[in-house]
């Protein structure tokens, strides 16, 4: 205790963290943090033919290896982020982790809310939905921040994640996993 403190108990406090504040499940975390912008992007299946800093149509790959990801739809890929130019585009990711988080925000060019739908192995997440998504996989980007999209229960396995944006003018920055 600090010298001179009076009336301070020695008991410890229990802190319960929810959502993205909960500690990562390190024993089942096999997928690393991933940046979407070309300055730091790794394991991306769709950038080999990309034209950076201009609109480009990306095809959805038929299959991804573990920790590989891809854009689909028309995006402008910039150094730190990618911005969706037309509705119906999204990101697919083959991952192995309990939680999927994505840092994203509305683009400066006017959108105030961008609705999205997430799927895991092609289906709505159901009970595996994160705090920013309902059981049907629906959510909305309203500001630039980290969104918790998936929170699975055990057993954790390699899974296919997809986020599809129902309107354009969203920016995606990075994935984190827990």
Question: Can you name each region flagged by the protein language model?
Answer:
Residues 1-178:
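Non-globular targeting/processing and membrane-anchoring segments
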């Amino acid at each position: 205790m600090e010298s001179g403190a009076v009336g301070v108990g020695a008991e410890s406090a229990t802190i319960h963290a929810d959502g993205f504040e909960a500690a990562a499940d390190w024993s089942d975390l096999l997928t690393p943090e991933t940046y979407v912008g070309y300055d730091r992007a790794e394991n991306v299946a769709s950038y080999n033919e990309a034209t950076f800093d201009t609109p480009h149509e990306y095809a959805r790959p038929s299959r991804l290896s573990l920790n590989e990801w891809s854009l689909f739809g028309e995006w402008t890929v910039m150094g730190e982020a990618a911005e969706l130019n037309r509705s119906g585009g999204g990101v697919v990711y083959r991952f192995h982790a309990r939680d999927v988080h994505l840092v994203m925000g509305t683009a400066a060019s006017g959108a105030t809310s961008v609705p999205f739908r997430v799927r895991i192995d092609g289906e709505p997440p159901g009970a595996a939905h994160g705090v920013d998504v309902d059981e049907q996989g629906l959510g909305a980007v309203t500001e630039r921040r980290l969104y918790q999209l998936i929170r699975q229960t055990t057993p954790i396995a390699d899974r296919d994640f997809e986020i599809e944006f129902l309107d354009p003018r969203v920016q995606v920055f990075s994935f984190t996993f827990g």
